[in-house]
Amino acid sequence: MRPLVATVDLSAIRHNYALAKRCAPQRQAFAVVKANAYGHGAREVVTALHDDADGFAVACLEEAAEVRALHASARILLLEGCFEASEYALAGQLRLDLVIQGAEQGEAFLAAGLDIPLNVWLKLDSGMHRLGFDPAALRAWHARLRSHPGVRELNLISHFACADERNHPLTEQQLESFLGLLDLDFDQRSLANSAAVLTIPAAHMDWLRPGIMLYGSTPLADLSAAELGLKPAMSLGAQLISLREVAVGESVGYGATWIAERPARIGTVSCGYADGYPRTAPAGTPVLVGGRRAILAGRVSMDMLAVDLSDLPEARVGDPVELWGAGLSVDEVARACGTLGYELLSKVTARVPRRYSH
């Protein structure tokens, strides 16, 4: 078997969910499990949080159906709403909390004539300008839906654009926009993503939406996961499968982009971009070999990558390699690659086996 595995610590996810709840006592929290629980395995994560989570949040009906099959009673928030008119009947059967983010969705919901009333979340475009009603339109839709028989709860939701950058002026503007609608009669309110859960108590409202923090990656630009008390959930582990000596002036990898400036010892690792490791990872990106730091040398290949082991003479074929995990944070690797931990975690592909610890 190819020596590559993503090991997921489900107890870390439970710890991180509990931390979110401790940040906002008496509030409830939707555990965000979209995109296969950010690459960690939705089935396993939902099962691990079955008795702890107040609800779950997903991006599409297919994800919602998977969660409902695992949890008969949890609230399931459909973050982007229904994409087609035909989906409303299934949303009703699944008893979803339904986001309505535009007039087209609102009209389709009214036309669906559902037999069972649903919890409806009107989405405010508070400044991100991605989804949602402007304040005036949202007020009009509140008036249309407040007493509609198809609506069980009428709720308010929005999403921050820059909460990861503390004290960003847009965050305060978005909060003020949200608060400006609370003269309306809403049953529940939700605004706080992971960054806001951790740093903006005024945004906690009734329902939190912890996402990336559940998986032990920091949502903040200036604080590490460890500083926030988060535990990493995924370790991506591979193995050294080859070693060779490379002379000064010789190159490594596709494009011959890495040139040895000294006699070099190069190791080949059983992980590549077809596994989700970014092809754009530059030379110098950190890895752990046998628990000690090494760096990438040359371009990442489809199934392999190369590391410079010149300073690790004790390294041997078969040694374990940690691409990220408990010893090397996914956020540090992401920074080296010019991206975010969100992307690295969610892009680990299906051909990488997942193993779970509890």
Swiss-Prot record:
GO terms for molecular function: alanine racemase activity; pyridoxal phosphate binding. One of its GO terms (biological process) is D-alanine biosynthetic process. Substrate binds at R130, M302. The keyword Cell wall biogenesis/degradation applies. Its cofactor is pyridoxal 5'-phosphate. It comes from the Bacteria. NCBIfam families: alr (TIGR00492). PANTHER family: ALANINE RACEMASE (PTHR30511), ALANINE RACEMASE, CATABOLIC-RELATED (PTHR30511:SF0). This is Alanine racemase, biosynthetic. It comes from Pseudomonas aeruginosa (strain ATCC 15692 / DSM 22644 / CIP 104116 / JCM 14847 / LMG 12228 / 1C / PRS 101 / PAO1).
